[in-house]
Amino acid sequence: MTDAAGTYRLIGAFVDELVRCGLRDACTSPGSRCTPLVLTLAGDERLRCHSHIDERCAGFFALGLAKASALPVALACTSGTAVAELLPAVVEAHEARVPLIVLSADRPPELREVGAGQTIDQLKIFGGFAKWFFEVGTHETTSERLRWIRALACRAWATAREGRPGVVHLNFALREPLVIDALPPLEGQGRADAAQLLQRSPQRGEDREAAARLRELIADARRGVLVAGRHERATLLGRAAAAFCESVGWPLLADPMSGARRGRAAIAHYDALLRAPGFLAERVPDVILRVGDLPVSKPLRTWLQALTDIPQIALDPECAYQDPAGVVSDWLAAEPAATLQALVSHGTRIDSDWLEGWRSADERAAEAILSVLSTDDLSEPAVAAELGVLLPRHATLFVASSMPVRDIETFWPVRSDPPRVLCNRGANGIDGTVSSAFGAAAAGDGPVVLLIGDVALAYDLGGLLAASRLDLKLTIVLLNNEGGGIFDFLPVSGSPMALADDLYTRHIATPTGLEFAGAAALYGLSYETVSDVPAFRAALERALAGRGSAMIEVHGERTANMELHRRAWSAVSDRLR
């Protein structure tokens, strides 16, 4: 048997075991040294193999797919800078707790540090952002080696998925020759029988000790608040949080990415309410329960940070310690949905006026915001509000960081059946957003809409190639306000130093000046631009009903957008007086 054939047998056994563990999707990018990895993955008919021309897009595509499917995705690349291109996606996956299995090809040890081409130090290249690193040598193909590499695949799958999900990096040192005439048959090689070597632990359920401790902590609470941050991994959290709050009479302040902005206890406009002078004076809670990641809303984070004398209890199965202000008094390592469900039957309404006061204020805030957005003019807040109403429950909204995710937080309504909302909020970057959204679309769980600004779209224009190359459908709603609108809300926008010689516009706001209709045509997306609410509704309906990917562009102006936000917040304050 040639060395190449032995390499393919080992990699074939490795991939076969990943598939037996549950692997469904793999992403590849071209190269020579990675040939055995790519051909083995692409040749396995049980896998969906998504081919990309560059590694950065491939990494973010795999990230979005893993987010949407809640399963690890394999990601194969060649040696050299190709591996380094994956770092941004690996960082986001680590911070957002998304499982990825990176399979990098490398030169064998004798070709390292001797000037061989396309050879860099790939060992632990991702540093602490990889949950586990392992250097894989192929060597001889013995029965012992086949058993070992299957066990390695099981360990990689389990490590990526169990506990705190994250990134596993396996570095394959591959010697030439790298090609053979045909893939060798597996026939269960390396197994004594057909039993899976890995038995995945069942999904964590109610932690009785944690539930008992939580029941004790909130037993005397008359005025509690539940804050639900992004928790994309817990599909049942939304319903559990809503049911719990309704049973105990607590307001539910839920980020749309938590899936919990539903039910009669949900307060949709807390971001605007918490900005209103005097609103909080009569609404001091005696306990706060926190689930999920830190909320996007700065007023909410500021309020939580100020409540240093109020018990704040965090439910987090991995105890990720998302508490930069150090105000959490109790950490309970428990699965939030199961724990809240266990407490519903034990909850008693303690102070009905407490929740009704929040709900009344929320209704007045909704009326105030509607009065500001009541015209047919299409603004960025109006787009966020319209998407919250128009998207079907089985849809997914992928939101870019920066202004789009903040507008969703502020203007997204309460619904009994909200669509899923995803966003790369682990490290909060705007890079790779288009590719991540296409990855979510590849999961095949209903229509996917991407809400994105012009700078974030320009950052990842290459990601649009997935529309034609992978035959995927994505509806892109582009908010084009000629630059990074988020900076207009920050102190730098009024800095005399930044405003001198127009430094703010050129170096901070950075308008792109691009005609995105040309980009849509280049990558095969249908395109239309809209300027009023009825036209937007019609365009969205056409895009969702159509076959291919589409881009709907909404033009705006940054200064007008900032003023509209301020008018909305001011209207809420006036309505509460």
Regions found by a protein language model. Name each.
Residues 104-156, 254-362, 544, 553:
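Glycine-rich, acidic loop regions that bind phosphate or pyrophosphate groups
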Residues 103, 110-123, 407, 412-577:
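Thiamine diphosphate
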